[in-house]
């Protein structure tokens, strides 16, 4: 009787152990929604897709990335709020978009601060540059890394050869006091508008121009509705990849390391794409014959 009872207990324990193991193996993967506002063929779009691929590879499927391009999920003006609410887990807004959360990153909006992307790299890889990734910690956000898009150019409805040519023109800008002051300094009227509305605003002549990289000007077809582009390289358009502190710390140590490794490789890939696309898209715009 005692032997039979012991065997039953052992059998039950074995069955429970097997069941627990099966449940653990069948646990749902962690879902990571990555939201961005640009096309998939841009540096950010290609980086996000590479990140999705590498996370699947490095985590063995324990973390699954879903990418939402072209403002399908959120625009940059709403995504950080959504992130803090847990509706999205990762994004890469332009550095100008963080002005509601910190003043530190406004430095990147200053015109003619960087000569080229090499000088940007030197700063971002410095102790000060890396320290700026922590500027959002008190707001519940974690900066994970920088991504280039490129140097900004000016597109407009009339030629811009000297600063005075911008006088009286309406330019779309991101929400940034620095960018606002930049255009006001040359007599232009800056208007803060979402990126997703820029093409329509240009097409309907609600605005006269905008500033952007070669990649965005080409991928969003701004060159089709703007007869003039001035190669000014006057400013930088970079992004910061961010997540919420709650989501980041909710990953296991192993998952966090794997996702971080995937991101670093993806950012290196994306930055190379940014370099190549600046050259390629500039030439495609020139070859189109639509702009001067």
What does each model-identified segment do?
Residues 14-24:
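C-terminal segment of classical bacterial N-terminal signal peptides
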């Amino acid at each position: 009787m005692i032997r039979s009872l012991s065997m039953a207990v052992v059998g039950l324990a074995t069955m429970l152990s097997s069941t627990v193991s099966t449940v653990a193996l069948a646990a749902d993967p962690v879902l990571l929604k990555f939201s961005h506002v640009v096309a998939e063929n841009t540096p950010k779009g290609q980086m996000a897709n590479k990140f999705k691929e590498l996370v699947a590879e490095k985590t063995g499927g324990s973390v699954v990335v879903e990418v939402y391009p072209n403002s399908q999920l959120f625009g940059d003006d709403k995504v950080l709020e959504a992130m803090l609410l847990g509706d999205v887990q990762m994004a890469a807004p332009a550095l100008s978009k963080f002005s509601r959360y910190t003043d530190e990153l406004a430095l990147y909006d200053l015109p003619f601060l960087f000569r080229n992307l090499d000088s940007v790299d030197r700063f971002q890889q410095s102790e000060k540059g890396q320290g700026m990734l922590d500027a959002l910690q008190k707001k519940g956000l974690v900066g994970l890394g920088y991504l280039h898009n490129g140097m900004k150019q000016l597109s407009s409805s009339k030629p811009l050869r000297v600063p005075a040519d911008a006088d009286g023109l309406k330019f779309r800008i991101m929400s940034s006091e620095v960018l606002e002051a930049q255009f006001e300094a040359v007599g232009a009227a800056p208007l803060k508008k979402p990126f997703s509305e820029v093409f329509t605003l240009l097409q309907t002549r609600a605005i006269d121009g905008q500033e952007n990289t070669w990649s965005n000007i080409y991928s969003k077809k701004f060159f089709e509705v703007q007869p003039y582009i001035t190669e000014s390289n006057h400013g930088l358009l970079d992004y910061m990849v961010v997540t919420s502190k709650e989501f980041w710390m909710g990953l296991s140590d192993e998952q966090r390391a794997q996702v971080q490794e995937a991101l670093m490789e993806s950012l290196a890939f994306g930055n190379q794409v940014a370099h190549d696309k600046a050259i390629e898209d500039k030439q495609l715009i020139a070859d189109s014959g639509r702009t001067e």
